């Protein structure tokens, strides 16, 4: 549901998660070149991994432990994309929860502002895989989050204390307005609230979701009104529920805010009779996701595509990576130009009533490689 909760967007790596856990704040938005008008989708990620990892007798952390600032731009038909990853020791970070504040060197994050820079030389990308290209990026951006996705009990203090999910999610800004300037390899890009189609969220937990899936867009075109919708946004996020040491099948959260009205679907609920089915298929040039969701009040069919050429590979160290062995990495693909359609219906005693068909543009997608065989789950 569209409910802001700044406490859930705060720093939360305490207790066991401080020794084996991660937290990542994500922001993505569209900018336009001041010189040429070229459109480019940028992303920023602030990642903290295992801040209190156990130390060996020689004084070295036994698990990967660092702060990473990742900045870049997704590929497009005219641009090959770029990922810049800068690593810092945990001791270099400063943070507070209320209000949200995070900084490392000249990089700053709060609820209403992002600023910083990353400069990676070609020499720094050599040797062990860092997941970084060479280049420079600098940003100074105002942030105004207008639609949130609140997952209710599934990220509550009780569920967090029970470690009920491998990874928790809070979408404080599934529709976010950004304003500012990004300098990318010497070229200036302007970010405007009306054309940025921004997205901001946070993940934290003891392990990354497997499979990892995120889909989102706030650029939705209505067939009914023949215009782009204003107070509307889509967000889909996977989760891996568990009970004690037992893991269950991966599930999905889905929220569509349609002109201010929320249509929410999660894994089976006895009260809402909610269910979701997912199918994913990888073809030669694109990846396709198909989702059917229904509860007692509404139904939704989502089809979303992303061209593989417009996706960038992102790499993550797992929170349980043992540095005494080879470091295991999670590899995902991400893009900022996904497209598709949403068919939305209201369920009445007499059947389904069509509400609208929406066209999706400039969608965010982050995913692992889909299974070769379609395996829907509910």
Where are these regions (language model features)?
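Structured soluble/peripheral alpha/beta segments that form catalytic or ligand/cofactor-binding pockets
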Residues: 1-378
């Amino acid at each position: 549901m569209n409910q802001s909760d700044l406490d859930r967007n705060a720093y939360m790596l305490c207790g066991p998660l401080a020794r084996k856990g991660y937290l990542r704040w994500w922001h993505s938005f569209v900018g336009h070149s001041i010189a040429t008008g070229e459109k480019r989708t940028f992303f920023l990620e602030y990642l903290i991994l295992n801040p209190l990892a156990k130390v060996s007798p020689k004084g070295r952390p036994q698990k990967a432990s660092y702060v990473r600032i990742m900045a870049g731009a997704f590929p497009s038909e005219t641009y090959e994309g770029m990922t810049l990853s800068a690593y810092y020791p945990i001791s270099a970070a400063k943070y507070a929860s209320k209000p949200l504040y995070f900084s490392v060197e000249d990089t700053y994050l709060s609820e209403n502002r992002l600023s910083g820079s990353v400069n990676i030389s070609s020499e720094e990308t050599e040797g062990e895989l860092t997941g970084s290209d060479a280049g420079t990026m600098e940003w100074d951006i105002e942030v105004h989050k207008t639609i949130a996705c609140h997952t209710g009990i599934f990220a509550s203090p009780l569920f967090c204390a029970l470690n009920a999910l491998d990874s928790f999610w809070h979408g404080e800004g599934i529709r976010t307005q950004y304003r500012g300037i990004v300098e990318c390899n010497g070229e200036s890009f302007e970010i405007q609230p009306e054309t940025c189609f921004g997205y901001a969220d946070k993940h934290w937990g003891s392990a990354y979701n497997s499979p990892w899936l995120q889909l989102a867009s706030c650029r939705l075109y209505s067939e009914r009104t023949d215009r782009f919708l204003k107070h509307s946004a889509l967000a889909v996020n996977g989760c891996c529920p568990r009970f004690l040491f037992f893991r269950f099948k991966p599930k999905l959260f889905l929220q569509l805010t349609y002109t201010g009205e929320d249509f929410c679907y999660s894994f089976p609920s006895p009260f809402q009779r909610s269910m979701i089915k997912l199918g994913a298929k990888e073809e030669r040039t694109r990846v396709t996701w198909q989702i059917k969701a229904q509860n007692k009040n509404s139904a939704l069919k989502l089809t979303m595509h992303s061209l593989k050429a417009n996706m960038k590979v992102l790499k993550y160290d797992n929170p349980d990576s043992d540095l005494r062995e080879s470091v295991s990495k999670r590899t995902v693909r991400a893009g900022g130009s996904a497209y598709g359609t949403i068919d939305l219906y209201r369920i009445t005693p007499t059947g389904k009533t069509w509400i609208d068909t929406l066209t999706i543009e400039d969608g965010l997608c982050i995913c692992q490689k889909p299974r070769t065989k379609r395996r829907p789950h509910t």
